[in-house]
Every structure is written in C-alpha cells, then in structure tokens.
C-alpha cells in the first residue's frame, strides 16, 4: 500500500513495521499538499510507535505550512488510532486492546453482560422511562482487560441522549449508577411499545474474542472494546470530573435494539473517576 501511495483507509498501517513507518515519515515531511498530509498523519498515527508519536508531537509544535488548511492538530489525528499525547508528549491510551461483540441469542439473558433494562424511573425532562443501556460484568474473565472488578452500569434517557450533547453517570462496582445532571428535551418520542421491545432484545456477548477492528467497519455490530465505527469523526469526551480524555468502551447501534432507529450510541469511560459518558452520532 505504501509503495503504491495508498493511504486510505489508514487502518492499513496499524502497527506497521519500522521500514514502512520511516517511508510514511519521509512522505509526510516532503509533502506540500494538505490532503496528502492529512492522510499521512492518519496513517502514521496508526503505526503508533514511539518514533511516530515523536513526529506527530513535533508537527504539533512546529506545524508545516499546509497545517493551516486542516481543521485539527496532529494530536487529534492520533486519536483516530486510539491514542494521543499531552503537552509534554506523554502517551495517552484511548482504546482497549481486546474486542468482543454482541450476537443474537436464543433467549433474553440478564445474567452477566447485556443491553437495555428499564429502570422504572422517569426522565425529569421528557418523561420517558430511563434505561440501563449497558450492564457490563467486569468480573467475567473475557473482560479482565478492562481492569474493573465489578459490574458497570451505563444509564440514560434513550430519548434525550439522542437529542442532546450526551449523558454521564457516576458508577460503583456493585452495579449501581447515578445519572448526572443533563440537558434534555421536552418532547418524548418513545412509546412504551418501543421501550418494551428494546428491553426484550436477545443480544448476548460473544464467547470468542473478535479482531480489534471488528466493529469499526460494520454498522450493525455492537461491540465492547476495540475500535468504534464512528458515524461522524472520532470523538473522545473529557471526563466531567478530572477533565482528562475518556476511553472508548462500547458502541450500540440503535437499529439492533429498536426497529427503524438511526445512529449509534457511543459509551466512554474514565476508570479512575468511575464516570461513564454516552453520546449519539448519526448521519
């Protein structure tokens, strides 16, 4: 791909070897085109080693003339590959290195990890019933990579989360969650029929680990870990407690649990502060 100057998709270069990396750096430093520069930044980010990080850091401090025609700095390009760096060039990991998917089971199963459970509480803004949109059992050996020895619950108003900037929770490892204050909407578009259907889904977690990019190129596969299938641009929210970038945890495509729904719910986590943030993207 590099020899033929194929720079899309950037995932082609994920963890590429030093020889490929050096060729990308050479091309990046020589280009005068913002379009080629943008693609090469993404490819180099996917390589993701120490030398690649150093080049991206240097380009943020001393940008090329074509940078003025791009929307974001090189550290944001690094986010496409699931990492970034701070002002001191300290590496920040934004994704997990394992991936599991949800698949259709024979029956509804609320033991362990599952999607969508009604909470029996109403949204203070629109009156829609609140849901635990994801319950994740970190004690399951499949999720040992999360480093969370307990049950994590992500809760939201399914109506408001699709029409607002997002909803955050504070969680405890006994499965409880506190929905933090959020800006909602007055109109409720969810009927009881929709909510019941959502809470009756038969999705269960896969027994086998999936490839890291398993969910990145499918808009009908719900995943935990790995890389997301961003509908718009990749987006890593800041933790409302500590202000640091949150890690991507999971994605749920609405049409897998709700007929004719559009868009995707992305779930991110700050393990240190025990904060979950959920937000919606759609075309």
Give a label for each model feature.
Residues 1-283:
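Preference for intrinsically disordered or flexible, low-complexity segments
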């Amino acid at each position: 791909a590099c020899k033929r100057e194929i720079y899309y998709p950037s995932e082609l270069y994920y963890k590429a070897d030093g020889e490929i990396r050096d060729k990308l750096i050479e091309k990046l430093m020589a280009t005068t085109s913002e379009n080629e520069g943008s693609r090469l930044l993404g490819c180099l980010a996917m390589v993701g080693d120490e030398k690649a990080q150093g080049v991206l850091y240097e380009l943020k401090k001393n940008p090329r003339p074509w940078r003025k025609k791009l929307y974001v700095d090189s550290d944001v390009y690094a986010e496409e590959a699931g990492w970034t760096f701070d002002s001191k060039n300290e590496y920040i990991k934004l994704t997990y290195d394992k991936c599991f998917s949800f698949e259709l089971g024979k029956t509804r199963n609320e033991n362990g990890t599952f999607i969508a459970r009604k909470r029996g509480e109403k949204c203070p803004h629109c009156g829609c019933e609140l849901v635990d949109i994801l319950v994740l059992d970190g004690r399951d050996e499949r999720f040992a990579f999360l480093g969370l020895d307990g049950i994590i619950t992500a809760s939201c108003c399914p109506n408001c989360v699709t029409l607002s900037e997002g909803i955050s929770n504070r969680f405890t490892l006994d499965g409880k969650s506190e929905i933090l204050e959020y800006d909602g909407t007055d109109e409720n578009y969810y009927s009881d029929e929709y909510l019941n259907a959502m809470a009756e889904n038969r999705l269960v977690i896969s027994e086998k680990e999936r490839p890291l990019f398993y969910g990145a190129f499918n808009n009908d596969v719900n995943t935990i870990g790995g890389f997301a299938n961003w509908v718009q641009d990749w987006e890593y929210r800041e933790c409302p407690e500590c202000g640091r970038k949150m890690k991507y945890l999971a994605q749920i495509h609405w049409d897998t649990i709700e007929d004719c729904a559009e868009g995707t719910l992305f779930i991110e986590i700050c393990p240190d502060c025990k904060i979950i943030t959920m937000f919606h993207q759609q075309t």
